[in-house]
């Protein structure tokens, strides 16, 4: 029991700064929406539409770079710190190449927005302008993620937390300047949010890079100042490890986007209730997501130390903590669902719909916790292909089709509207949780030599 308590303390010490960093990042999006909404409803809608395109594109790159965390953790645990700088340099090369692709996608997003039916021309123009401003922040965001993954792989999660809140503090005045036109700048409205956010991402990268250059704990793994050509073999390994995670993130983000589109013809009450429940459950998701990041670090570090048994302890301790926290957040959601809905809206019908959907959201928080921490465990074991297949099957083969049948058709039951899709979420996430646990157990039953050899690749 003592080894589990000791591991729990170390996991929480890593996870709490990650939770706060995620809160800071989520708050930036909230601030953008509120400050754009103060100009006009059109500006707020333009930011919302632009963000719905930005997120899948940038999270694909983010997922690709998550491969760096277990690589650094394993090298650090095995005492091969001299190899870390080379891996980080290749991750910067990878981030630069992915940035170009993301920028091309965002620059041409106008074709996607234009293909949507009945979109107000002014909204379309502002959304495209927002994306064209924001795309210049893509390299800064991805370079920041490389520096963050480097720190987290070394069990240093506080720098990203501090820099995240610094970014939030910088974002507010920059929004004010570019949205309303101060200090000689033109008033750009919602487009100004894109300019401000892109600038903030570069500020965050510069600050965290400066910190890593000066940190005493990282002096032995400083990046060489001279130019070095990309190591395509190392980049290929990082891509092979990160691509399944990137695709899994893409599947998840696009799933919720597709459901939002499918719910949209069901009327304002249904759409608003669905959006409120989804927004609140996304806030609750920050806790298990951060635990998943901490679990990747601990499992990778233990495997680097050559202890498959201690990696197993880290994995199951994280699942235990996650289930306990999910029970707390689920009970909180059930107890205060109506009051929470009232924070978002004052329409009684919308509040009732949101409160009903939050009951379903409370149910899926348990499965969501198990599956996202399971994904963190598998990343630590460098078994990322399994994450891709599990996510695809759970979300797109099971969750979405069942949700559509229950929500929009009478084939199984009378059409349930948004509730049907939420039942689909529960089925998909529960399936994912079961498959993640099955995969964890299968990996842990393999000979220690096999597990350690995979981790050392």
Curated annotation (Swiss-Prot):
Keyword Magnesium: no
Stored InterPro entries: MATE_fam, MATE_MdtK, MdtK-like, Multidrug-R_MdtK
Transmembrane spans: 11-31, 53-73, 93-113, 127-147, 159-179, 188-208, 243-263, 276-296, 316-336, 357-377, 386-406, 418-438
Location in the cell: Cell inner membrane
Chief localisation class: membrane
Source taxon at top rank: Bacteria
GO MF, any single term: antiporter activity
Example GO biological process: response to antibiotic
A GO term from the CC aspect: plasma membrane
Keywords annotated in UniProt: Antibiotic resistance, Antiport, Cell inner membrane, Cell membrane, Ion transport, Membrane, Sodium, Sodium transport, Transmembrane, Transmembrane helix, Transport
Pfam families in the record: MatE
Membrane protein topology class: Multi-pass membrane protein
Disulfide bonds: none
PANTHER family xrefs: FMN_FAD EXPORTER YEEO-RELATED (PTHR43298:SF2), MULTIDRUG RESISTANCE PROTEIN NORM-RELATED (PTHR43298)
Main function: Multidrug efflux pump that functions probably as a Na(+)/drug antiporter. Confers resistance to the hydrophobic cationic compounds norfloxacin, ethidium bromide and berberine. It provides protection against antibiotics produced by epiphytic bacteria, such as P.agglomerans, which cocolonize plant blossoms.
Family designation: Belongs to the multi antimicrobial extrusion (MATE) (TC 2.A.66.1) family. MdtK subfamily.
Name of protein: Multidrug resistance protein MdtK
Source species: Erwinia amylovora (Fire blight bacteria)
């Amino acid at each position: 029991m003592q080894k589990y308590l000791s591991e729990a303390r170390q996991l929480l010490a890593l996870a709490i700064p990650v939770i706060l960093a995620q809160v800071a990042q989520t708050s930036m999006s909230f601030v953008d929406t509120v400050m754009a909404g103060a100009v006009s409803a059109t500006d707020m809608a333009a930011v919302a539409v632009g963000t719905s395109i930005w997120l899948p594109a940038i999270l694909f790159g983010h997922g690709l770079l998550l491969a760096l965390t277990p690589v650094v953790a394993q090298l650090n645990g095995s005492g091969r710190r001299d190899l870390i700088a080379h891996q980080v340099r290749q991750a910067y090369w990878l981030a630069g190449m992915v940035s170009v692709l993301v920028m091309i996608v965002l620059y041409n997003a106008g074709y996607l927005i234009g293909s949507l039916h009945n979109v107000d021309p002014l909204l379309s123009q502002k959304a495209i302008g927002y994306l064209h401003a924001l795309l210049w922040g893509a390299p800064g965001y991805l370079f920041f993620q490389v520096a963050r993954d480097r720190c987290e792989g070394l069990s240093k999660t506080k720098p990203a937390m501090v820099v995240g809140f610094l970014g939030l503090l910088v974002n507010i005045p920059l929004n004010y300047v570019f949205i309303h036109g101060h200090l000689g700048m033109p008033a750009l409205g919602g487009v100004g949010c894109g300019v401000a956010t892109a600038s903030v991402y570069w500020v965050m990268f510069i600050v965290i890079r400066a910190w890593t250059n000066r940190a005493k704990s990282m002096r032995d793994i400083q990046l060489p100042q001279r130019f070095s050509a990309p190591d395509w073999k190392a980049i290929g390994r990082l891509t092979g490890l990160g691509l399944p995670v990137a695709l899994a993130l893409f599947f998840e983000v696009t799933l919720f986007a597709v459901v939002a589109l499918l719910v949209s013809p069901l009327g304002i009450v249904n759409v608003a209730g669905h959006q409120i429940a989804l927004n609140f459950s996304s806030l609750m998701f920050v806790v298990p997501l951060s635990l998943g990041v901490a679990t990747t670090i601990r499992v990778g570090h233990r495997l680097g130390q050559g202890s498959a048994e201690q990696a197993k302890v880290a994995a199951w301790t994280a699942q235990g903590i996650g289930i306990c926290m999910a029970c707390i957040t689920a009970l909180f959601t059930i107890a205060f669902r109506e009051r929470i809905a009232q924070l978002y809206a004052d329409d009684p019908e919308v509040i009732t719909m949101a409160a009903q959907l939050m009951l379903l959201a409370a149910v899926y928080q348990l499965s969501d916790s198990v599956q996202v921490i399971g994904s963190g465990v598998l990343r630590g074991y460098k078994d990322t292909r399994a994450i891709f297949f599990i996510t695809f099957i759970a979300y797109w083969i099971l969750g979405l089709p069942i949700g559509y049948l229950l929500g929009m058709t009478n084939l199984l039951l009378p059409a349930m509207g948004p509730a049907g899709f939420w039942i689909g979420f529960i089925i998909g996430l529960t399936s994912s949780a079961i498959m993640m646990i099955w995969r964890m157990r299968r990996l842990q039953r393999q000979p220690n030599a096999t597990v350690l050899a995979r981790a050392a690749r």
